[in-house]
Amino acid sequence: MKWSAAAGAALLALPANSAVTASLPLKLETRSSLNSRLSNIHVERSASVEGAISYTYGSCQAKREEEAHHSISQPTDAHHDRLVWVIPENVQSGGCISAWSRANGRLVGRSRPQSFDFKSIKMRRDLKARATKPSDSVAIHMTTDNGINPWGPWFDGVKLLEDKEISTVDVEKAKSKNIAIVGAGMSGLMTYLCLTQAGMTNVSIIEGGNRLGGRVHTEYLSGGPFDYSYQEMGPMRFPNTITLGNETYNVSDHQLVFQLAEEMNSLNGHSKNLSVDFIPWYQSNSNGLYYYDGIKNPETGLPPTLAELAANSSLALTRVSNNSTKSLSQKVDAFLPDTDKFFAEMAQNMFKAHADWLSGGLAGLPGDQWSEFGFMVNYLRGSLNDTAFLSASAHSYWDTLYEGMYFSASTWKTIDGGLNRLPLSFHPLVDNATTLNRRVERVAFDAETQKVTLHSRNSYKDSFESSEHDYAVIAAPFSIVKKWRFSPALDLTAPTLANAIQNLEYTSACKVALEFRTRFWEHLPQPIYGSCSTTSDIPGIGSICYPSYNINGTDGPASILASYISGADWGDRWVSTPEEEHVQYVLNAMAEIHGEELVKEQYTGQFNRRCWALDPLESASWASPTVGQHELYLPEYFQTRNNLVFVGEHTSYTHAWIASALESGIRGSVQLLLELGLVDEAKATVDKWMARWIDV
């Protein structure tokens, strides 16, 4: 059936509640913008209708079901109050949704005329087509053929629902599904927030430890948050804006953190005890110290500052590199994307940038299929010696690119009182739904009942307790999940997912915080205010970060992150050193850099060491996929396997940041809502959290 554009426009002008429509027993309406190929149709009953019902879309003047443009649904469930409308590509505005009695063919319901946002629909289709363009690669390519496009704009929700054959939704039943979230880190907390705000009424959290926040861990060496002697033993900062040329951009993916803080402050009535407030983070300071080869300024007794180094380059050690190393470095730079252009793209839309990188970001080559080492040696024919000098790894350049953009940020933020205040703000929301000190170790799925059973215990000495759920969202890192037992075995039902759980690589970090009686670093001849700018060649120390909070504060002690180092070489190696020995080593390094007498007089004896590989609930710091693992594993995270949804920073496009965990929680929530046919709620979640690259 066809109707003219003029007729459609005329129909749109009709009043919404005509006498005929108002007298019918079924009220039909859409409640969200028709800007994609999916929508919910809401069904309300003013009177009962006997027998089955057919739903169609077509002319608002149609008198018979056969006159419709297309059929929407012929549900067998008489108790439905919502339909899932998969909208054909050749649809036109101006038509109405109609309901017909299948017993006698009579019209029993009709909506007001519908208007489609074709511009948005086309934009989504074009973005999807670009993200899934064919390649000669032998790697797995996720296209619209299988309904999921995980490399950039998340997944194709239309195809997902077509595959699931969902046409009607009992909303009350869907929203009462029993959902367990395993893990109360930031991805688990975000999942809980999204699902409950979407109206899910039976959501619980099972947490293996005794606190919320996971790897968000602020250590208060003296007092509380506003005694200002703390350090971040997990994440500690958020890139906010980046200036490239004459343009300044928001680092858009990290805006999720700031938006979440606003949301939690609002939910908590702006309570002072629960507030999440941001202050500037000082990433760099020109008075940071440069301590290499034992060189110090004889006048101050301190290493040269970065400002002094800039004024006198002879103070810096110069690494000898031969011409072939320089040439190889220049060749690599020529193949990588233009820095300013790609940094701007990543800042504005990390997800589109990721898709572009995978499809041909390495000068036309698929970005995730070349490791740094393999590209230099096998493609550019660099020597092993030159490649070693350039620190080529088994990872692709993606991590180098997005971390390069983040650490080029012009402004940064952190949370006043410590990042712990972000998970702290969730307590009023989740406490009644959270079970602490329950470590899930086994997961069983019953295909007949479609139920998930979680087996957990507090200690390895305890017997297992079990709980049954309709779905489980796994928000624990794979470094822990790899020790779990699944029934049926995942390598039989989802071998690529099982491969990801067992083989996704992680990086470990160690941090040592030391407390001092005063903020002595702010009273040096060239005072240091915040920043991680002090560096040295003392083995195993890495970054030294001075606090960005309470700058020029006069009361009480303060703490320095005296060592922050990661990677297989030191993040793993330090765990074999006893804590007291490790702390003494770091204290000695601080004394060597800042002056032995000063440091020993100022040190209070309070410290904290956290090597994340020793944490029984984490076993590592963050995911660090090797070459090919993004391209191979990301599609698996977008598929619901045995009623399990996997979230966490390890399932995101970037790693090691709170924003990565939050993004995965939003994605997992939308994935589950779409599984249940709650399209309007999925759209609302997407729109609220600005994740508009999902096609729903």
UniProtKB/Swiss-Prot annotation:
EC number(s) recorded for this UniProt protein: 1.4.3.2
InterPro entries per UniProt: Amino_oxidase (IPR002937), FAD/NAD-bd_sf (IPR036188), Flavin_monoamine_oxidase (IPR050281)
UniProt similarity note: Belongs to the flavin monoamine oxidase family.
Substrates-to-products reaction catalysed: an L-alpha-amino acid + O2 + H2O = a 2-oxocarboxylate + H2O2 + NH4(+)
Binding site for substrate: 237, 564
EC class (word): oxidoreductase
Species, as recorded: Neurospora crassa (strain ATCC 24698 / 74-OR23-1A / CBS 708.71 / DSM 1257 / FGSC 987)
Positions with a binding annotation for FAD: 207, 215, 236-237, 440, 649, 658-661
A GO BP entry: amino acid catabolic process
Full protein name: L-amino-acid oxidase
